[in-house]
Regions:
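Bacterial Sec-dependent N-terminal signal peptides
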Residues: 1-24, 674
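A sensor for short, sequence-defined functional sites
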Residues: 20-674
Length: 674
């Protein structure tokens, strides 16, 4: 998997005109007086100092546990930077397996009449939010924020797990100094992985931890037989020894901010980060256990998990319904579609992710609600029951990132995949307006992994192989200096899905507001929407539009914008270069056929020339053709994007094509009196 962020670390000596003290509580008057970041004067805030420490501690009877300690000091320059004063720390919290946040303290510093004043973070600024059934966001909001404030806070996370969370090395604001340290007992071997273009390297050293380790049985180091991280002691006999720590440190200055660009799937996918994959555990008895995995290992481990497999294979609760919905159907693909549509209507998604069931498939079926695992493992079971070759496809949602190596921990979602006649059919029954091979937006994230009971697996593309189409037809004429138009739009596939998801329960007034172009003077009326509820059809719209701003009378000549209020007004791609891909979401075709009646007594004296622009490798194209036919101005415009993701090396070509689009769509037709 290729990432497109290049992290350039440059040392700027003498850039900060004062010596900073990085100890907690030692905020200086000079830091408070600083009006803007010397290197990034437009930033709303800067991390002055960030420290992130990971270590493992031995506790008799419990084994090793992980402790994470974080300290951050942030300078806020503008009110727009106040969002950095609210911090969320995600911790695992499910049943008896939980991480605990503690030792939280923080202060806000302000300069008042030349004196440094500080205000303590109080309990009324600390609160928790449940993210899902497995994670909590421990949040706190710093008090008395002002432009010019400096905030600092520190906290610890106690974790019973050996897995080390990904360590972010870059934010959307600059980081002036960052220190990372990991102290890892010699028994635990990790593979350190970074974004391929994030130029980082850790210094390495060793020390001796003077702690006696008493080992009971084979699992005494805090690794369970299946899930690494949880302590399971047992057996007879014991031994003791001290151990050494492997120490990894990173100390960097002036880390640039992650640039916010338009059309990005998930900006966090491209930030610099350090990933630590548990590869092996060697306990003092010398019995190694490997955790490095291939995709075959991942597949085997999932199919060995009873909580997953038993739910996927459970089938006694739906058989009467299954018989009814497949009655009279002989074609396997018809059975597949019938079952898929039934599950979509039967069980509603509770907004919780995860490829493991939450309520259990039977309970979800009976109560009509469940998480992603409940719904789609149920779907797989029903498809298998009618002898379709259905298996799970694991994936990571856009918000969860992209797995860099074979792992089951990088996935947070499961869909159904059916292999039939050398074709693969993907289905997600949690999304009522999706369809076969048309996944919801949250699930279209690079590749998934189809896993089979025989231990084999394969990568699966999650983007559709065909374009979604939107077609717009306009009949217009100029009446009393105002362009009056009748518009018909047909939205297919993902265009229809997105419209339904946004407006299915909305009144017409909300839909009219959604149709109005931003910063355009357009009145829309008489809106009719057909097939909004029918997932198998296009969404069809028709409405009347009045647009006075698209025509201008200058000295008796009429200057008309033939694209009306559909013109692309500005190029979304303004940066000179780009470090990450352009994400369009899915292939699409956007086509306009516009017919404008030439006013009586006028003739066309200037008409925009046609163009045809193409991106290389058939990634996309743009066609514009205007002509005068039988008293009408006829305009045909089509934008086609065939690649849902266009790599950063092709950015300049995309930018150039959109420059042409903006220029062409804002050209005028000139009408003069005949």
């Amino acid at each position: 998997m290729k990432f497109f962020l290049t992290l350039t670390i440059t040392l700027f000596f003498g850039l900060t005109p004062y010596c900073q003290n990085y100890k907690f509580g030692k905020v200086s008057k000079e830091e408070l007086e600083e009006k803007s970041d010397p290197q990034y004067p437009d930033t709303d805030a800067t991390v002055l100092y960030r420290e992130y420490n990971v270590k493992f501690e031995w506790t008799q009877g419990s084994g090793f546990s992980q402790e994470i300690e974080v300290f951050e000091r942030v300078k806020i320059y503008k009110p727009e930077g106040f969002s950095w004063g609210t911090v969320g720390v995600k911790t695992f919290n499910h049943d008896k397996s939980r991480e605990e946040l503690g030792s939280l303290k923080g202060y806000t510093y302000n300069l008042e009449n030349g004196s440094v004043e500080k205000e303590k973070l109080k309990s009324n600024g600390i609160f928790d939010e449940r993210i899902n059934n497995y994670y909590i966001s421990n949040k706190f909001t710093m008090p008395n924020l002002k432009a010019g404030s400096v905030i600092e806070y520190t906290y610890k996370i106690a974790s019973p797990f050996l897995q080390i969370d990904d360590i972010d090395l870059q934010y959307t604001i600059p980081i002036r100094k960052e220190v990372i340290e990991l102290k890892i007992p010699e028994y635990f071997i990790y593979n350190q992985v970074s974004n391929p273009q994030a130029k980082i390297s850790f210094d390495y050293s060793r020390d001796t931890e003077n702690v006696d380790v008493v080992v009971r049985g084979r699992s005494g180091l805090g690794t369970a037989s299946y899930d690494p991280g949880m302590d399971r002691t047992g057996g007879h006999g014991s031994s003791s020894s001290s151990y050494k720590n492997n120490i990894f440190t990173l100390d960097e200055m002036n880390i640039p901010p992650l640039t916010v660009e338009p059309l990005v799937d998930n900006l966090s996918n491209y930030r610099a980060k350090s990933i630590w994959e548990l590869a092996m555990v060697n306990d003092p008895n010398g019995i190694p256990k490997s955790y490095s995995t291939t995709w075959e290992d991942v597949t085997k481990s999932i199919y060995e998990n009873d909580a997953f497999v038993n739910q996927m294979n459970r089938d006694g609760y739906y058989e009467s319904d299954l018989s009814t919905i497949t009655d009279g159907l002989d074609d396997p693909l018809q059975k597949m579609a019938a079952i898929y549509n039934f599950v979509k209507s039967k069980v509603r998604w509770n907004q919780y992710l995860g490829y493991f069931p939450e309520n259990g498939v039977k309970k979800a079926y009976n109560e009509g609600i469940g998480n992603i695992g409940d719904i789609n493992l149920m779907l797989i079971s029903m498809l298998k029951k009618v002898n379709l070759n259905a298996n799970p496809v694991l994936l990571s949602t856009k918000s969860n990132g992209i797995p860099l190596f074979p792992t089951r921990y990088g996935f947070n979602y499961v869909i159904a995949g059916v292999e039939f006649n050398d074709k693969l059919y993907l289905m997600d029954a949690s999304a009522p307006f999706s369809n076969i091979n048309m996944l919801p937006g949250r699930a279209m994230n690079w590749q998934g992994r189809l896993i089979r009971p025989d231990g084999t697996s394969q990568g699966v593309g999650l983007y559709p192989g065909y374009p979604s189409k939107e077609q717009t037809y306009v009949q217009a004429e100029i009446i009393n200096g105002v362009l009056e138009a009748r518009v018909r739009q047909r939205k297919g596939d993902h265009f229809a899905r997105e419209y339904r998801e946004e407006f299915v329960n909305s009144p017409l007034e909300s839909q009219i507001s959604g149709l109005k172009p931003e910063n355009e003077i357009v009145e829309i009326s008489e809106l009719e929407v057909k097939d909004l509820q029918s997932n198998s059809e296009n969404v069809n719209l028709s409405y009347k539009a009045s647009a006075p701003a698209v025509i201008e009378d200058i000295n008796g000549e009429l200057y008309l914008s033939p694209m009306l209020f559909f013109a692309q007004k500005e190029n979304p791609f303004k940066a000179e270069s780009r470090d990450y891909p352009v994400y369009f979401g899915y292939p699409f075709s956007n086509k306009y056929n516009i017919n404008i009646k030439i006013p009586e007594g006028y003739k066309v004296t200037s008409l925009p020339e046609g163009i045809k622009a193409n991106l290389s490798n058939n990634m996309g194209s743009y066609t514009y053709l205007a002509k005068e036919v039988g008293g009408m101005i006829q305009l045909s415009v089509e934008l086609e994007i065939n690649a849902p993701i266009i790599l950063s090396q092709d950015y300049q070509f995309v930018k150039a094509m959109f420059t042409q689009i903006v220029e062409k769509e804002n050209e005028k037709v000139v009408l003069t009196k005949a």
